[in-house]
Amino acid sequence: MALPTLPFYWCSQQRLNQQLARQREQEARLRQQWEQNSRYFRMSDICSSKQAEWSSKTSYQRSMHAYQREKMKEEKRRSLEARREKLRQLMREEQDLLARELEELRLSMNLQERRIREQHRKLKSAREEQRKLIAEQLLYEHWKKNNPKLREMELDLHQKHVINSWETQKEEKKQQEATAEEENKRYENEYERAQREALERMKAEEERRQLEDKLQAEALLQQMEELKLKEVEATKLKKEQENLLKQRWELERLEEERKQMEAFRQKAELGRFLRHQYNAQLNRRTQQIQEELEADRRILQALLEKEDESQRLHLARREQVIADAAWMKQAIEEQLQLERAREAELQMLLREEAKEMWEKREAEWARERSARDRLMSEVLTGRQQQIQEKIEQNRRAQEESLKHREQLIRNLEEARESARREKEENEELKSARKQELEAQVAERQLQAWEADQQEKEEEEEARRVEQLSDALLQQEAETMAEQGYRPKPYGHPKIAWN
């Protein structure tokens, strides 16, 4: 019996599905484990943070503050109860005191009633006496008013009083005119004195302002001169910085030339060594050494010339560098003379001797080159350090100069602004003083005009009153002359006096 067979792709699909299911289960387990771990770490972080917070000084202080607040509340409550108890005690004492006073008042009511009755009787009798006095005074006034002789005497006195009053009014008017004239003179004198004082103050203020303007102008000129000097100094510092940068570039160029010469020398040595031309090599090597020495001598000569042209700063270090450069120059010149002597000797050597001499001289040259390179490196390094220090000093000086110039410019701007504000204030002050003087003049003129008008009105009123009085007197005299004498009616029969 034949077994059924399954296609290959079906088996592969089933294995792939199983593998995907296992992978998903594994990812789910990993995700669940990751969530558990993250939850654990999150809870541990929360616990540790809370524990740290509870055990921190801030939590301790907060707890102590809460304890102190509760303690203060308890103390306040006890204090409030004590005050309430004290108030209750005071209220009881006050009630007892009021009860005693009420009892005493009730006992003294009868005595007070008797006193009031006695006082009422005294007041009544006093009123009766006062009424009697008033009645007597009224009777006396009535008799005095209705007595003909007294009336004639009063009329004569009134006429005399009127005549005397006219004289008195004339004298008072003259005195008022004199007083007004003196007051006007006093006002004029005060006005002139105030005007002179104001002019003197304005003159003194103008002189003070001119002096301040002069001093301020001198200060501004001095600041402008200082600003110009700072600008010249800044230009000089910029030029010096450019010169120092050129010197540094020159040193770098010289050092690069030495490196190139060294590389060229090494290549030439290799070629000469391969060709085994010892005599020619010795000659060329000698010439090369001479050229190197000559180049080093030129470099040192240039350094010495640069040092002579630079400013006299860092004197001790510069003298040491100059001395080292001079000594190096002298040593190079001596070695140059020695190499020339060696070159003359080489012309007389044989090949084997030249070979031995080559090896010997090569060792000597290597030692000398090493020492010379070391010395040149020290000299160049010192020179570069010196140039770098000068550049830094120049930069700091430029920064200080720039700050100083900016401060001077700000001072100039502030001075100009202050001068402008002061000028405006002076103009406003002058205008205010002028307006004040004009107002005073106008007020004086108005007062004088009002005084004149019042005097004219008073004179006109007096003239009108006098005319009216004369007209009334004349009319009354004419009426009395026409009517004749008429006795005045009285309420009781008048007794004819003999």
Curated annotation (Swiss-Prot):
Instruction: Report any Pfam family annotated for this entry.
Output: TPH
How is the polypeptide modified once translated? Ubiquitinated. Ubiquitination by the BCR(KCTD17) E3 ubiquitin ligase complex results in proteasomal degradation, and induces ciliogenesis.
Q: What does this protein do?
A: Tumor suppressor which has the ability to inhibit cell growth and be pro-apoptotic during cell stress. May act as a 'capping' or 'branching' protein for keratin filaments in the cell periphery. May regulate K8/K18 filament and desmosome organization mainly at the apical or peripheral regions of simple epithelial cells. Is a negative regulator of ciliogenesis.
Which residue stretches, if any, does this entry annotate as coiled coil?
11-39, 66-353, 380-479
Write out the biased-composition intervals (Basic and acidic residues). Answer: 389-405, 415-437
Region called Trichohyalin/plectin homology domain, residue ranges: 259-425
Supply the name of the protein: Trichoplein keratin filament-binding protein
**Region Disordered, annotated ranges:** 168-191, 386-405, 415-498
Q: Where in the cell is it found?
A: Cytoplasm, Cytoskeleton; Cytoplasm; Cell membrane; Mitochondrion
Its chief place of residence is cytoplasm
Please name the gene that encodes this protein.
TCHP
- UniProt keywords, alphabetically: Apoptosis, Cell membrane, Cilium biogenesis/degradation, Coiled coil, Cytoplasm, Cytoskeleton, Membrane, Mitochondrion, Tumor suppressor, Ubl conjugation
**Origin organism of this chain?**
Pongo abelii
Going by the entry's taxonomy, the superkingdom of the source organism is recorded as: Eukaryota
Q: Which family does it belong to?
A: Belongs to the TCHP family.
Q: How does it assemble?
A: Interacts specifically with keratin proteins including, KRT5, KRT6A, KRT8, KRT14, KRT16 and KRT18. Interacts with KCTD17.
Q: Specify where the region named Interaction with keratin proteins lies, as residue ranges.
A: 73-498
PANTHER family attached here?
A: TRICHOPLEIN KERATIN FILAMENT-BINDING PROTEIN, TRICHOPLEIN KERATIN FILAMENT-BINDING PROTEIN FAMILY MEMBER
* Cellular component per GO, a single term: cytoplasm
Which InterPro entries does the annotation name? CFAP53/TCHP (IPR043596), TPH_dom (IPR043597)
Please cite one Gene Ontology biological process associated with this protein: apoptotic process
